[in-house]
Amino acid sequence: MTPIKVVVHGASGKMGQEVLKTLCQENNLHPVGAVDIRAENPAMALPDGSGSIPYSADLSSILSQTKPDVMVDFTVAKASMPAVRIAAAHKVNLVIGTTGFSPEEISEIEQLAKTNDIGIILAPNFALGAIIMVHLAQVASRFLSSAEVIELHHDKKLDSPSGTALVTVASMLEARGEAFNKPPKENLTDARGQEHDGIRVHSVRLPGLLAHQEVIFGAAGQTLTIRHDAFSRECYMPGVLLAIKEIVHTKGFVFGLDKLLKL
């Protein structure tokens, strides 16, 4: 089997480095290039010490030089959108883990997949446990009409609420088919978080955290809490690998890893 050639955009970041380390451990996946705005040297040493790969801030140059099958993107929305446009123009399939896109940007990404006849998966979360958490919250939403979401992340995360929290809320509302019970009014504006059709969403940003979320349902005499905790970025890698392997056989746009898991 011919190895899948992968370029990592955001390669100097923590997620980018974790992706490269994981790719080096896979026989059928081959890291061929690294891109990052902070690139100064023409080559990046691979984390496992097995060699180096072309490294540049110029994405178009790296794509032309390496001709990858897939580009993995873990950056920020402002940097990701131009990169997605460039990769699509080069007919490179995309695995996007960046969050913070506007609805208009997501629509553009979907159109880029169609126009360029490539596969693009955009997933707010690649941790399999987090995907299952959202699925279980959907199930509970059919039976319990009061709920709140608390998401907690490290203090360097720029967007809030998190992409996972927004997907969770949207999935819960879709499963329920109507708004949740309206929470009590707040005396201090925004003290109770952001409301989405009856679901309050609370965002916590603190050093020492990585990525955590809990969905709390309440009813007379009982509560149900569904929680996922990510303690290291290693937990995202099985999902990233699945996405890379599937997207080379997929045309069009896929939103969410749950579609690949067939939940």
Curated annotation (Swiss-Prot):
Coiled-coil regions listed: none
Major location category of this protein: cytoplasm
InterPro entries: DapB_C (IPR022663), DapB_N (IPR000846), DapB_N_CS (IPR022664), DHDPR_bac (IPR023940), NAD(P)-bd_dom_sf (IPR036291)
Residues reported in the UniProt entry to bind NADP(+): R38
Identification of the protein by name: 4-hydroxy-tetrahydrodipicolinate reductase
Residues that, per the record, bind NAD(+): G10, A11, S12, G13, K14, M15, G97, T98, T99, A123, P124, N125, F126
A Pfam family per the record: DapB_C
The protein's role, per its UniProt record: Catalyzes the conversion of 4-hydroxy-tetrahydrodipicolinate (HTPA) to tetrahydrodipicolinate.
Keyword Transcription regulation appears in the UniProt entry: no
Organism: Dehalococcoides mccartyi (strain ATCC BAA-2100 / JCM 16839 / KCTC 5957 / BAV1)
Enzyme class: oxidoreductase
Highest rank taxon of the organism: Bacteria
Pathway: Amino-acid biosynthesis; L-lysine biosynthesis via DAP pathway; (S)-tetrahydrodipicolinate from L-aspartate: step 4/4
Subcellular location, record wording: Cytoplasm
Gene coding for it: dapB
Keywords, alphabetical: Amino-acid biosynthesis, Cytoplasm, Diaminopimelate biosynthesis, Lysine biosynthesis, NAD, NADP, Oxidoreductase
Gene Ontology MF annotations: 4-hydroxy-tetrahydrodipicolinate reductase; NAD binding; NADP binding; oxidoreductase activity, acting on CH or CH2 groups, NAD or NADP as acceptor
GO biological process: diaminopimelate biosynthetic process; lysine biosynthetic process via diaminopimelate
Positions annotated to bind (S)-2,3,4,5-tetrahydrodipicolinate: H154, G163, T164
One of the record's GO cellular component terms: cytosol
PROSITE patterns from the UniProt entry: DAPB (PS01298)
EC number: 1.17.1.8
